[in-house]
Amino acid sequence: MGAFDVVVLGGGTAGVHVALEAARGSKSVALVEAGLIGGESPYLACLPSNSLLLSAARGEAWEDAAARRDDVTGGLDDSAAALRLIEAGVAVIRGTAQITGPGTVEVVSGAAAGEIVSLAYSDLVIATGSEPVAPPIEGLSDIPTWTTAEGLCSPDLPRRLIVLGGGPAGCELTQIYAAFGSQVTLVEAEPGLLPGEPAFAGEILATALRRAGAEIYLGSPATKAERTPDGLTLALEDGTRIDADRLLLATGRRPRLTGLGLDALGITVTPGQALPTTTSCQVLGPEHVWAAGDVTGSTHTHASRYQAGVVAANICGQPREADYTAIPRCVFTTPSVYAVGEPARPEFATARVSLSEVARGRLGLDDLGCLELYAADGVLAGAVAVGPDAATWMAEVTLAIRAKIPVSILADVVHAFPTYGEALQAAFRELARVDQTEKGIGPLSELGMETPEDDAIEQHTEVVADEVTTAGRRELPFDVDEADAAEQARSVGFDDDDYR
């Protein structure tokens, strides 16, 4: 029997990072994984999806995009990832693990034709990830289907594709295959795309996907699937019938916990439910048992990495708790979606800015984009943005929520012109104005701070000067009189509403 300070079950993002950090903390570590070291994210999910989306944006042919994707994912070769662990001192064991009791695990080796390896541990980390969930649709097992992983690593481009599920993965895959010429139909049982996010985000994304050529059915679940001579037919509850060559299932995932032997530790888990954990990522019940990643119900790669750091710190004697108030939620479509923190609530102050209201929004070809910020008691609580590369210019919001920075401070932050950050600037100032009004302090201008109206005039002035010059009508002086900005705008064909 091999004895280790730490045994990690699962070699995905969470498991790998726990193992590396624990090894750096002078712990002896064994990691058990039956599949790819590194998990699905770098091979079958996030990286191939983003690779294909970027190739689509560049206008590449499918063959070139697929080749680039395969290069990015290393051809599903995890030897480099395994070597990194080994060089860090981690014992990598290929096989399927089962907990046999407190402090012991048995591994059926995948490398030694079923040999059983016994391991002893002081701390156990469960990081076995998640698996796709197939919906209860009559006839589903009789038709050609893809999981999201199969859809992202396929060498083939289907002529007609149905994507079932309008969450982040379903929307990304819809845009990918529509961009490369497939006839794509997206079906979502809920009334809108991206269930759980504000309706405006799903509405904007639906508009973008329809413009890309996708057909979208909302609010009617699929009830029956039938194989046909040409492929398949999917029937919806409202009577709609859709023909396709293949059905891609993007209908969610569940924690992969079956067969682990959790009952040997006195842990009872409802099928499909996450492992209950403390804020220290310790599994409720037995001591020295930890969990990180999808098994906890947190389905984002960056959240898995964060939890792994919390687990490793606690195992190494450095008490740490996880704070989930600012975990980003991203959809890497065009336009992209970035959400963080709490959703809108009636008691929250809300600021909403269309990206077309800032100068940068007038420079792009995409007219779709909007930002909403939510604040409570003068502190930012949540945010949702839809727009070009939203994840890049919304990162400061994540920091603001995590650090509980007052909106009065955020409102005084200077953003470069012309950037989408100016949409944040306008929203911060609106939230600060509401906060000051509620506290009876007075307008921002009395505090020596620009108001949202001041900002709008400045944007109006700068854009008008730029547009007039670009139009070749006449050069305006560098110092444009703000009082004349609206009149000058009208003189070159702009309405006052263009900058509101």
What are these regions (language model features)?
Residues S141-R159, R241-N314, A400, A411:
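FAD-site-proximal beta/loop scaffold in flavoenzymes
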Residues F4-L31, G170-A179:
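N-terminal Rossmann-like FAD-binding beta1-loop-alpha1 element of flavoenzymes
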Residues G2-V16, R24, P198-F200, R211, ...:
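Mid-to-C-terminal Rossmann-like scaffold of FAD/NAD(P)H-dependent oxidoreductases
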Residues C46, T128-Q183, V187, E215-I216, ...:
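Glycine-rich dinucleotide-binding loop and its adjacent helix/turn
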Residues V7-L9, A23-P42, S182-L193:
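Glycine-rich FAD pyrophosphate-binding loop
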Residues E21, E40-Y121, E197-T223, A344:
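N-terminal Rossmann-like dinucleotide/flavin-binding domain of flavoprotein oxidoreductases
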